[in-house]
């Protein structure tokens, strides 16, 4: 294997990783770790964080190598800049000079130079369950890279937003799919920017924006956002058609509180908010839901496998049983939601999973058990833009 410098930060990062028990998000665990080790400077913390996340992104691959070698492989595949840290770690100039290449090209170079052998199914778990239309290798190796920072510009504030960012010399990019989808620098302080403070933009991943663009709201229709979370899709929906009669629900009041704060910032007051457990057909809250809706958004709980580039530690804790449990929960939720969807109404089923058990398998089960027409289903994959991967199916109730 190639020679690397066993930097002392490797030892700290490995100690941090070995102490993690998967009971909380790694980001929260790492924050506590740094608080317990205040002598680590900001540069060391940044490098340790990068080492840890690189390690998780490698998944279970390369276990035939030592921990130090695995750490170096992971760092090389995921590192995106030439700096003093990378130059101290890698001794081979070919590695240093190629560090800006795409991870797949870097892996090919490691194969050529050192006969490196990594199995894709070890980098990403249960590849046999992944949606067939997803370009698997591209998806897996893109997972070594951080997600880009995307915002959605509200159409009526497009000129003001562009002017503000241009005046402040912000290095932004507009995505070719929409002049309202903008990429900002990863380290940009969005929440203190003029467009955010004035409510001209929303932080929303590109794939989520593209999913929301499939909604087709008509004036005065009744819409239900059943698993509303922080309300990003509802906000996009209201920007498309402000006159809809909107109800948002979720399983906990605390989730809806966050949504309400976000709606308040956007001066949105004309909506209904309810705590409902849609997975429980016998729930009092469920049985009290008597309205019929013209359209329902069911962005259901899932494995989150399309977002694991953000939380790569989850690749090491997922099991097939967990994926199947999500599938059963998703069917239960949507099965109950169909009771409040009027005939001719649209059900928008979505996940941020790449596993077919949670996507087309659930949709096929719904279509086979109900009078539904599947009019559209797709994997939303914008790999070249380093965004999340999502799934969407639109069904009409007959």
Name these PLM-found stretches:
Residues 1-398:
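S-adenosylmethionine
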